[in-house]
């Protein structure tokens, strides 16, 4: 049919190109970005499981009102002056 001539394909890299240059810079940057997103996702999953297993470890023992001196809880008049 074609007379024995090979069909050019953009999916197959040419013989004179190395394996590194088969990916463009944009593809390499996208690949690195996706890998970084997977690492970030893994860190978040580990952190969520740690919070689920021991939820009271990450909570502070004091409340916001413990630091107020001379003021009753909920009274904010002249607190910044």
UniProtKB/Swiss-Prot annotation:
Protein's name in the database: Cortexin-3
Ranges that cross the membrane: 29-49
Family under the similarity heading: Belongs to the cortexin family.
Gene Ontology terms: cellular component: membrane
Family matches, as InterPro entries: Cortexin
PANTHER family: CORTEXIN-1-RELATED (PTHR16736), CORTEXIN-3 (PTHR16736:SF1)
Residue ranges that the Swiss-Prot or TrEMBL entry lists as coiled coil: none
Location(s), subcellular: Membrane
């Amino acid at each position: 049919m074609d007379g024995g001539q090979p069909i050019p394909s953009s999916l197959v890299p040419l013989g004179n190109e190395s394996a590194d240059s088969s990916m463009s810079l944009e593809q390499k940057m996208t690949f690195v970005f996706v890998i970084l997103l997977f690492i970030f996702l893994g860190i978040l999953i580990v952190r969520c499981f740690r919070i689920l297993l021991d939820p009271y470890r990450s909570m502070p023992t004091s409340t916001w009102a413990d630091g107020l001196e001379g003021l009753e809880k909920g009274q904010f008049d002249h607190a910044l002056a």
